[in-house]
């Protein structure tokens, strides 16, 4: 299935992908090579997923390496509990519908959109929400969801048995790909959950839905992903009263919810758990994190795991 198979490369090198548990198909890489007549092994973590992520399996642990290159996106923080975040999402949707508005949910097309659909379906089945109309207004998310549907072999056991990314009795899912279909959503004044890109509101169809809903007090915007400083999403999260959207200044009257437990990235504890699975004290290179975060994570790794660590500078080359 793409994971766990050993592949040969010229010069005696070999590699294998293992499930990183981040999004569908994400992988860590094991690479074996010869050095001075001896076999050596380097592991590249890739983006490591969070334990208990919806739909996909938890990250697979690796136990041996001479060198490990590990990400540090959230190397200095711990995530909010997922179940508490799911309860917050249900509450936000119910409050919005009670006010007679629409829910706008900016979302990444791959991973987050599918997770949100899965969670909404679960909330409907549990009776926490009912009679939902969900619009996935993103051609890329539509294509990504079709890929998810085609590969249930990568799902965890719970997802395999519970959700098929199709409409059910209590939740109608509408995938809209054409501009005409997208524009029709603008006629809906209440009772819709509109999922659209981009996740940080820098482009995509979410801006068009903002134009028709962001000035309405009865509507809401639910952010489930980190908003980078300088983006429209971050501007809204930080409490802006108005914003230029599609060339027009608009008042931001919709209620803004920021729900923090949906990250697909491992937090500090889960990164340490993944790294702690190595039994032979590899040398660790910490990458893919803002410098203060990477340095703080390096300190934690040294203190808690006793490993030799290094944080490379951007563009730095290292010989191993």
Which role does the model predict for each range below?
Residues 31-34, 59-62, 119-126, 151-153, ...:
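Short, solvent-exposed amphipathic alpha-helical segments in soluble enzyme
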């Amino acid at each position: 299935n793409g994971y766990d198979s050993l592949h040969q490369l010229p010069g005696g090198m070999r590699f294998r992908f293992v499930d990183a548990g981040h999004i569908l198909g994400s992988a860590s890489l094991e690479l074996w090579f010869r050095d001075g007549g001896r076999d050596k092994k380097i592991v590249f973590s890739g983006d490591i997923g969070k334990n208990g992520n919806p739909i996909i399996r938890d990250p697979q642990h690796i136990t041996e390496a001479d060198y490990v290159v590990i990400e540090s996106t959230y190397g200095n923080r711990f995530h909010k509990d997922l179940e508490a975040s799911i309860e917050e999402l249900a509450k936000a949707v119910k409050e919005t519908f009670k006010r007679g508005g629409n829910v706008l949910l900016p979302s990444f097309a791959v991973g987050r959109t599918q997770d949100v659909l899965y969670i909404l379906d679960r909330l409907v089945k549990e009776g926490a929400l009912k009679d939902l109309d969900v619009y996935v207004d993103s051609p890329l998310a539509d294509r990504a969801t079709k890929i998810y549907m085609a590969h249930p072999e990568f799902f965890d056991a719970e997802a395999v048995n519970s959700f098929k990314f199709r409409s059910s009795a209590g939740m109608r899912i509408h995938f809209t790909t054409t501009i005409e279909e997208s524009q029709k959503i603008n006629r809906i004044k209440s009772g819709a959950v509109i999922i659209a890109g981009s996740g940080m509101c820098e482009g995509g169809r979410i801006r068009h839905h903002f134009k028709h809903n962001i000035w309405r007090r009865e509507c809401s915007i639910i952010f489930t992903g980190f908003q980078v400083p300088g983006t429209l999403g971050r501007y809204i999260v930080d409490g802006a009263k108005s914003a230029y959207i599609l060339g027009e200044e608009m008042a931001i009257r919709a209620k803004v919810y920021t729900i923090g437990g949906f990250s697909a990235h491992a937090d500090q504890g889960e990164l340490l758990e993944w790294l702690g699975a190595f039994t032979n004290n590899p040398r660790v290179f910490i990458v893919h994190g803002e410098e203060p975060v990477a340095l703080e994570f390096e300190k934690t790794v040294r203190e808690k795991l006793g490993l030799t660590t290094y944080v490379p500078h951007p563009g730095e080359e290292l010989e191993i």
